[in-house]
């Protein structure tokens, strides 16, 4: 088994899906090359969903985004992100097709990821959380209500409180041992922003991930989402988000929560209001009593518009975190942490 890190640099394991991890990884690679991106493998929407259904391959989309974020070559990044605009490949990113082709030709998704990483010359390691072909299930036992599939769950307007639902992957997966090793060996574990129920939850519920998070000596940081999601996390506060993260992982493991306290400009606020999405509120009284420390700041980043050629239905985030500000904050926290916890 390949070692996710080499010595003598800050070692960071980033846990997440595609968009949230991409944002963080793009800035983090400027500070260290010892990065392990642990990636959700339950995606079945958009281009990824079509390739899974038609080719029987594992989901490439989130893995591609993480690899692209860690590449220093703009030409290769653009190539892997290129989306076809016409023909039978319309809506597909070239990187998704390449990863699926490599998996089919080698018979191994792990080998496909390693080969594509070599092509992109990435700084770091991209680690699928599991190498099993799984689908996401969300179940409210008390209501006898079940939703199946990441795409279905992502688009659903929940009839019941999601905090009373259980998340699971079917069939029950085996954790990728490299993911556990990365969490255990890291100096910092960074849980990236992302959809609670279709991006972060499906990764954290894999047996072995939560145990590793509780066992690690690393500083564990959760970067809270910027906005709520209509029909799913309406009125969720910062502590609500953090509580769900730890529920998925089976117990307490967060040391710091980073959250945004900057308000968007009027135009951006109006665009979000149309989608009934609002800046996540910091419930400061609850935060002051939490077992973790919290750090608020101005973390709003740039607006991202719909990609050209991206015509396969999928949800794309409108705004990103200011990744440079997030990364600087994490490094400052670690400098304080290591002085306070010298044995770690």
Annotate each PLM feature.
Residues 2-11, 29, 33, 121, ...:
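Non-transmembrane, aqueous-exposed alpha-helical and coiled segments at domain scale
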Residues 32-33, 216-220, 254, 292:
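A short helix->loop->beta-strand "cap" motif at the edges of active sites that frequently abuts
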Residues 203-210, 236-241:
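Charged helix-capping and loop-helix junction motifs
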Residues 136-193, 197:
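Active-site gating loop/helix substructures
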Residues 1-61:
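Gly/lys/ser-thr-rich phosphate-binding loops in alpha/beta enzymes
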Residues 235-344:
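C-terminal functional extensions of proteins
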Residues 19-25, 193, 198-205:
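Short glycine/serine/threonine-rich phosphate/pyrophosphate-binding segments
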Residues 42-161, 313, 317-321, 325-336, ...:
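Electropositive, gly/pro-rich neighborhoods at or near active sites that engage anionic ligands
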